[in-house]
């Protein structure tokens, strides 16, 4: 129904299902209302509606990162709020809540500037940013959240606030890394960088080369500069027409490269990797930065159900590689995908304006995505348990899933001191925990 709250869709109305369902449907739910907000005023009205009816509030743009069910909640879908504007002179962009990275790239590329986007151009930019944001320029420039200049959000009292380090230092600190626990962000101003091209793409190795490739990769990353970002995906591709023929229906080891220095230097750095086992497909090349989404070549719009887990690793030793190959390699028949991303570099450095993003001590992120089937989940958990000796004990919530919603799992994403501070900020701005349809940070029991 069209109301003072915008299009507040109820379960029996046309468009309700389309508005409530995201890309990853692991936490499918039936909200009391879905508000497809067209602007920030409708977001604020939706929060006031939730307050009036004493309902929790959730937010979704693309639905890549579900956490908990939004049953009986007010779910704000921001996909209509996709505005992007660029101030080339200041090297900044203003990004509305529902804009995807693809649209941001379309606006920044003509100015010779690049955002600190993620690997998929179809992910919502703001959701990525409030989770920290580990992208393909991160080893060079740091987490995307480190480069947020200002933001505008709706807090639990229904107020629209312009937030900077000067106006609300605690709130500004908490939102950059604290997800949507403190309010609904309707827009952000972020830094842009003078990166116009990348030497990047994928080396797709046959499954039988997995052990050789991973051992070589673990040594190779110890010597690369911060301009080099890389990751490795272990996956058994489906036998489908949209999968390139050399990769179709077989296990592959997909090594991704994104080098933001000179192409000749990138080619030199990648050469040892090209000398490894059978390469089925090589897409590494000099490319415009706007084509960065082709490097990981991730799925675009087909809905799926995946239980995602993430652990941060301090090292990738030979023993750790052997465990990954044994439990997730070509002979394991693992019913899940496994991805390693190289961290370090600027990720490890504190930002000029502090935020709560954790995991800065990690050398790698290990991500798994599994279908919700008991045996597959057990085998995935066995892999994660066997890697415990190399775990930092932390996690990255942008790579976490519906099984990581416990207080202990959320707390593991932050340092103990930062988590205590986050709970104090939560108690100040959302004492009733209205914003809890997420990886929840509960308010401190008392706050003064």
Swiss-Prot record:
It is an enzyme of class 1 (oxidoreductase). The modification Pros-8alpha-FAD histidine is found at residue 64. One of its GO terms (biological process) is response to antibiotic. Its EC number is 1.5.3.-. Residues 27-195 form the FAD-binding PCMH-type domain. Its cofactor is FAD. Keywords: Antibiotic resistance, FAD, Flavoprotein, Oxidoreductase. SUPFAM superfamilies: FAD-binding/transporter-associated domain-like. Pfam families: BBE, FAD_binding_4. Induction: By mitomycin C in concentrations as low as 300 nM. PROSITE patterns: FAD_PCMH, OX2_COVAL_FAD. InterPro entries: BBE (IPR012951), FAD-bd_PCMH (IPR016166), FAD-bd_PCMH-like_sf (IPR036318), FAD-bd_PCMH_sub1 (IPR016167), FAD-bd_PCMH_sub2 (IPR016169), FAD-linked_Oxidoreductase (IPR050416), Oxid_FAD_bind_N (IPR006094), Oxy_OxRdtase_FAD_BS (IPR006093). GO terms for molecular function: FAD binding; oxidoreductase activity. Belongs to the oxygen-dependent FAD-linked oxidoreductase family. PANTHER family: BINDING OXIDOREDUCTASE, PUTATIVE (AFU_ORTHOLOGUE AFUA_1G17690)-RELATED (PTHR42973), FAD-BINDING PCMH-TYPE DOMAIN-CONTAINING PROTEIN (PTHR42973:SF39). Involved in mitomycin resistance; oxidizes reduced form of mitomycins. This is Mitomycin radical oxidase. It comes from Streptomyces lavendulae.
């Amino acid at each position: 129904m069209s109301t003072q709250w915008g299009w507040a869709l109820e379960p029996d109305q046309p468009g309700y299902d389309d508005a409530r369902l995201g890309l990853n449907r692991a936490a499918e739910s039936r909200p009391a209302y879905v508000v497809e907000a067209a602007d920030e005023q409708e977001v604020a009205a939706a929060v006031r509606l939730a307050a009036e009816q004493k309902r929790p509030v959730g937010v979704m743009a693309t639905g890549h990162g579900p956490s908990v069910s939004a049953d009986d909640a007010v779910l704000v879908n921001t996909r209509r709020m996709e505005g992007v504007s660029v101030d080339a002179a200041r090297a900044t962009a203003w990004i509305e809540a529902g804009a995807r990275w693809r649209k941001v790239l379309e606006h920044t590329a003509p100015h010779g500037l690049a955002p600190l986007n993620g690997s998929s151009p179809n992910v919502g930019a703001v959701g990525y940013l409030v989770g920290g944001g580990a992208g393909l320029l991160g080893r060079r420039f740091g987490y995307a959240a480190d480069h947020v200049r200002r933001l505008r959000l709706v807090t639990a009292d229904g107020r629209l606030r312009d937030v900077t380090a000067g106006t609300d230092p605690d709130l500004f600190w908490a939102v950059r890394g604290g997800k949507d626990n403190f309010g609904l962000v309707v827009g952000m101003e972020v830094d842009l960088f003078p990166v116009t091209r990348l030497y990047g793409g994928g080396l797709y190795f046959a499954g039988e080369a997995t052990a050789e490739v991973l051992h070589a990769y673990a040594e190779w990353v110890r010597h690369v500069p911060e301009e080099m970002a890389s990751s490795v995906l272990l996956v058994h591709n489906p036998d489908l027409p949209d999968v390139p023929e050399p990769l179709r229906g077989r296990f592959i080891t997909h090594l991704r490269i994104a080098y933001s220095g000179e192409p000749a230097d990138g080619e030199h750095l990648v050469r040892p990797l090209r000398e490894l086992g059978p390469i089925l497909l090589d897409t590494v090349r000099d490319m415009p930065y706007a084509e960065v989404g082709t490097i990981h070549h991730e799925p675009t719009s087909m809905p799926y159900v995946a239980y995602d887990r993430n652990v941060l690793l301090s090292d990738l030793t030979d023993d750790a590689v052997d465990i990954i190959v044994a439990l997730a390699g070509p002979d394991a028949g693992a019913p899940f995908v496994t991805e390693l991303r190289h961290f370090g570099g600027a990720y490890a450095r504190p930002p000029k304006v502090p935020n709560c993003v954790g995991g800065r001590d990690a050398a790698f992120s290990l991500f798994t995505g599994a279908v919700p089937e008991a045996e597959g989940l057990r085998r995935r958990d066995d892999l994660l348990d066997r890697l415990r000796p190399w775990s930092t004990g932390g996690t990255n919530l942008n790579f976490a899933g519906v099984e990581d919603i416990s207080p202990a799992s959320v707390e593991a994403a932050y340092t103990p001191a930062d988590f205590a501070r986050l709970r104090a900020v939560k108690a100040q701005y959302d004492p009733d925990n209205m914003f809890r349809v997420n990886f929840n940070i509960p308010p401190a029991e008392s706050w003064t």
